[in-house]
Regions:
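Non-catalytic, conserved peripheral segments adjacent to functional cores
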Residues: 1-92
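Conserved metal-binding segment of the jelly-roll/cupin
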Residues: 91-107
């Protein structure tokens, strides 16, 4: 039986010293997904972005917060899913990430 993936919060350890910090954002062996590309975006405080979803070339995503925090809303769009339309709310703090499977929209 194929495992159904759901979105989840990823907490990573941040190593801090007088120079700043170091933190791993992604490890293949921990996440078991293939990375096709990476991107970086910056949003100012109180910005609301639209829901993001790719219909033809679906993308599994890991959204990481470098500084500050975000509220990310994630919606299941998988056809014939018993959870179709289910909404998840994630408060993602500085240094944390969320995993979003390819059949979910987020924003």
């Amino acid at each position: 039986m194929k495992k159904i993936l759901k979105p989840y919060l990823i907490k990573k350890k941040r190593f801090v010293d007088k120079r700043g910090f170091f933190q791993e954002l992604f490890l293949q062996k921990e996440n078991k997904i293939k990375i096709k590309f990476t991107a970086l975006a910056n949003s100012r405080k109180n910005v609301i972005r639209g829901m993001h979803f790719q219909f033809k070339n679906k993308q599994t995503k890991i959204i990481s917060v470098i500084s500050g925090k975000i509220l990310d809303v994630v919606v299941n769009l998988k056809k014939n899913s018993k959870d179709l339309g289910k909404i998840y709310y994630f408060t993602v703090n500085e240094g944390d990430s969320i995993f979003i499977p390819n059949h979910y929209a987020h924003g």
